[in-house]
Amino acid sequence: MALWGGRFSQAADARFKSFNDSLRFDYRLAEQDITGSVAWSKALVSVGILTQDEQLTIEAALNDLKLAVLENPEQILQSDAEDIHSWVETQLIAKVGDLGKKLHTGRSRNDQVATDLKLWCKQQGQQLLMQLDKTQQQLVSLAREHQHTVLPGYTHLQRAQPVTFSHWCLAYVEMLERDFSRLTDCLKRLDTCPLGSGALAGTAYPMDRTELAHSLGFGSATLNSLDSVSDRDHVMELMCTASMSMIHLSRLAEDLIFYNSGESNFIELADAVTSGSSLMPQKKNPDALELIRGKTGRVFGSLSAMLMTLKALPLAYNKDMQEDKEGLFDALDTWSDCLEMAAMSLVGMKINEARTKEAALGGYSNATELADYLVAKGVPFRDSHHIVGEAVVAAIAKGVPLEALTLAEFKAFDVLIEDDVYHHLSLDETLAKRKALGGVSPVQVEFALTNAEKRLEERDTSGISIRAARLTDLDDIERMVNYWANIGENLPRSRSDLVKAVGTFAVTEKHNQVTGCASIYVYDTGLAELRSLGIEPGYQGGGQGKAVVEYMLRKAEQMAIQKVFVLTRVPEFFMKLGFRSTSKSMLPEKVLKDCDMCPRQHACDEVALEFKLNVVGQTINLKAEKLAS
């Protein structure tokens, strides 16, 4: 179904339709389009276009559609709809009839697609932050393991000065830290909601756009409707951030490819990230790393194409802007894949420590130490540089390292050189001297490594925040509780019950959108029950359940409660958090009365578990406390 047919007297040519349609790639925005449509339906209630009952009908149908899409997104591609917006509207009308035709009131596909794309960028950006963090974690772990492994440092691909493998790892940790910072800043800048901007002049319906923005998890609404539908800065900025990061990943890949070569023989990559040759049986090729290096140009190309698309483009929406998605999707998918492969390539990598040390000792990499030695004796550096250059030439002619020259041979270059020169030329001393911040001395490497470990430990990449529930959260809580009750995982709870109990609830938020809940009920005996744990469908598996349970346990501990129990059909989840089996006979009588509301009361398959607070061996993850702050 086209959304614009009334103006036309004949159908579009099939070839034009194929050229014009975007469903084959913008189907990836289905979840975001449905989420935005639910929020828009609520805004239409506030301006009298929809009744409360109509909105609830539309929301229920859209939520059912979202679940179907999450289970099988490829089903969308079986449609001949023009784009994802047409597909969602067609599906909604099929479910609720003419009521679905009201949904697009006051909305344009211009502000709709801008909102969908920003929602997708926020979600994808959060995943990329987690992947950057994971790659950094792997580098730091490798750095700790090989803190004292010596490695030759290179300039111009010639041995220059000795470093450590740990120092090399930490160099890339810093590069990825800048990528993390850039992506974080980018996500802050795109945290504005265009919905309600209409085609270009704004919606004709006086809704609260700030409230609408907050309901979708945005920090604020955009401030100019014309800019809102024209803006694709966030697309370019994300691609630019991806391009910068791919440069870093490509350099890391190139280093490791060189270290892995037979000529270097510093490392051996794991079988899991290498492949063989169809002709040469002995080959073990670093394909994962070579593909990272090769795919870097692909990301650059997407950025270049987007810059050219937007150059000199008039304001408001132009069909050229349909070209924003394929390049963005591909660039961020590629970046994500390369981050995953980079982290995988670091796992199981073997370091040939004997070979790296041998290489670090070669190439006259201690020549700078001899120059510094002469400077300490009062020789100007430029003169000492020249003297050492002559000494290196003599050592090369003799076929020996610098430290193998005799004292008499050294004195031929400068009489100030004494027996202590050999100590200064040793590998350990060469490393130990680099004590300034950021240097390669063991002290500085330990300092940098400890700081990196602390920084990563304290960082929260989950995108989850937890807080006490408010009355304004009731719609979300009721929806989640009763969704899981309908499929038999929770006890059903009425609206009036939830209103009375809202003070016992906590909610989780992702991108300022409520996506999880749980409550705690305290009995006269001082025993507490964890109740109504629910996560928004489609958001499971992201750590929210664990986070909200830990938050509730912390709350119980602050109330001096000594034991929290739960009745559950998924005991494995709670046992991973420290809960232990207990007998239902030990539970308060009121719990058994509540079972009367359960549809499975005559064939109960719930397991009783308990968590004893302030008991050795059962501790609460303090991260829940951090998330709440």
UniProtKB/Swiss-Prot annotation:
Pathway assigned in UniProt: Amino-acid biosynthesis; L-arginine biosynthesis; N(2)-acetyl-L-ornithine from L-glutamate: step 1/4; Amino-acid biosynthesis; L-arginine biosynthesis; L-arginine from L-ornithine and carbamoyl phosphate: step 3/3
Record field: catalytic activity: 2-(N(omega)-L-arginino)succinate = fumarate + L-arginine; L-glutamate + acetyl-CoA = N-acetyl-L-glutamate + CoA + H(+)
N-acetyltransferase domain mapped to chain residues: 464-598
Protein's cellular compartments: Cytoplasm
Transmembrane feature ranges: none
InterPro entries according to UniProt: Acyl_CoA_acyltransferase (IPR016181), Arg_succ_lyase_C (IPR029419), Argininosuccinate_lyase (IPR009049), ASAL_AGS_AcTrfase (IPR011244), Fumarase/histidase_N (IPR024083), Fumarate_lyase_CS (IPR020557), Fumarate_lyase_fam (IPR000362), Fumarate_lyase_N (IPR022761)
Signal peptide (from-to): none
GO molecular function: argininosuccinate lyase activity; L-glutamate N-acetyltransferase activity
UniProt-listed Enzyme Commission number(s): 4.3.2.1, 2.3.1.1
SUPFAM superfamilies for the chain: Acyl-CoA N-acyltransferases (Nat), L-aspartase-like
Region (Amino-acid acetyltransferase): 500-629
Similarity comment: In the N-terminal section; belongs to the lyase 1 family. Argininosuccinate lyase subfamily. In the C-terminal section; belongs to the acetyltransferase family. ArgA subfamily.
Miscellaneous: In bacteria which possess the bifunctional enzyme ornithine acetyltransferase/N-acetylglutamate synthase (ArgJ), ArgA fulfills an anaplerotic role.
Name by which UniProt lists this protein: Bifunctional protein ArgHA
Organism: Moritella abyssi
Lineage of source species: Bacteria, Pseudomonadati, Pseudomonadota, Gammaproteobacteria, Alteromonadales
Recorded name of the encoding gene: argHA
